[in-house]
Each structure stands twice: as C-alpha cells, then as structure tokens.
Amino acid sequence: MAENEAQKLINFIANAKKITPVKVTYKGTLATEVPDTVQQFGDESFGQLIGDWSEIELLIKNLPSEDVFIENDSRNSAVPLLDKKEINARIEPGAIIRDQVEIGDNAVIMLGAVINIGAEIGANTMIDMGAVLGGRAIVGENSHIGAGAVLAGVIEPASAQPVRIGNNVLVGANAVVIEGVQVGDGAVVAAGAIVTKDVPANTVVAGVPAKVIKEIDSKTQQKTALIDALRGL
C-alpha cells in the first residue's frame, strides 16, 4: 500500500465521527420525538431504536430500567464493520472484519478471524480460525494463513511498510510475521515461527527467530497443498 493510501486510512480514522452504536428495545412513551438519525421499528409505546447512544439516551431517559433492554458492543467507535452482503467469498460467523478491507473472490474467512482496516486478501486465500491480520496487511492469492497466526499491522507512520504475503504461501498455526516483513511466493512459514526478516520465495522457514531451513521440494509441496474444494461457493 502506497504511503498516500496509508495516509488516507489515518485521515479516515482521525476524522470519523466516533459513535456508540446501540439497539434498544423499549416499552412505554418516549421522552421526545425520534430524530431522523435514529431508526425506529414499532411505535411510540413499544418497539426498537437503533442508532448512537448519545441520541437514544435522551429518548428513553424517562422509562424505568425494567422497560428497556440495551444491546451495545462498542464505545466511541471510529471504524464500522465491513458490509459483507455482496462479497464473493465465504465468511463464517464470528469473523470480525473492519471497513475498508479488500477480500478477493472465493476467499475463505474462518470463525474468529480478526481483520483490521486496510488489509487485503487475495482470491482463493483462506484465513483460518483466530488468525489476526493487522492494519494494511496484504496476503496474495491461493495462500493459507493458519489458525492463530498473526500478521502484524502498521497504520502509523504512513511511511512504514506493511506485511506482505505472496501467492501460494502457507503460514502455519500461531506463527507471527513482524511489521514490514515480506514473504515470497510459494514459501512456507512453520507453525509457531516468529518471522523478523524477509522470506525468499519457495523456501521453508522455522524457529524463533525464523530462519531458512530448506528450499521447497516435492515432498513439502505435497504436505502443504491447498484443497480447491474448500474454496468453492
């Protein structure tokens, strides 16, 4: 991601209106008229309100607590979650994906994955359970980021380089790739490795810190082959 694109993300977060989104089910007469910025389902005596707490709090201030049920999962949030309805990928329940994330065709995002703003995921790539892609992390096509793996994010400074994972790469479970590291096409990062330096294409790295232990051979290719059927929609 170019420096000017990183700066756009920084500006977006800095200038975004911070909101505390809530969904409130209520019974009784609201204190004031519902503004256009709050969604209302039902009527003035029973229904649901969806919007920012700063506005809804004023509407329900006269209602007893037993007549109000409040659902809330964030406070002063600057970045909404990604609208996933039109994405041509498989995204399982429990994945947390923030806005301004790019997801390629037939990618798979497993439950519990966390993907921060500005991240990019290539076509046919799988992000496994509990994996974390930090801000601006980039993963190429036909790759696999293993369960619990972390690709460190870097939003600031704008000049900092993000993690870049190439095409046809396997990152093993619980591996960590540090900010700015580039992993070349066809490489394999062993489970639990801590990657602090760039990884050449078609090599296997392992250890803490990770070091090249061999080049990719036919045996390694068989062990790390991805299954296309898992990526079909």
Swiss-Prot record:
Q: Which domain of life is it from?
A: Bacteria
Pathway it works in: Amino-acid biosynthesis; L-lysine biosynthesis via DAP pathway; LL-2,6-diaminopimelate from (S)-tetrahydrodipicolinate (acetylase route): step 1/3
Going by the UniProt record, its keywords in alphabetical order are: Acyltransferase, Amino-acid biosynthesis, Diaminopimelate biosynthesis, Lysine biosynthesis, Repeat, Transferase
A Pfam family assignment = Hexapep
Reaction(s) the record says it catalyses: (S)-2,3,4,5-tetrahydrodipicolinate + acetyl-CoA + H2O = L-2-acetamido-6-oxoheptanedioate + CoA
Q: Name one GO molecular function term.
A: tetrahydrodipicolinate N-acetyltransferase activity
EC nos: 2.3.1.89
Task: Give any single GO term for biological process.
Answer: diaminopimelate biosynthetic process
Q: Which InterPro entries match?
A: DapH, DapH_N, Hexapep, Hexapep_transf_CS, Trans_hexapeptide_repeat, Trimer_LpxA-like_sf
Which HAMAP family does the entry mention?
A: DapH
Task performed by this protein = Catalyzes the transfer of an acetyl group from acetyl-CoA to tetrahydrodipicolinate.
Q: Give the family from UniProt.
A: Belongs to the transferase hexapeptide repeat family. DapH subfamily.
How is this protein named in the record? 2,3,4,5-tetrahydropyridine-2,6-dicarboxylate N-acetyltransferase
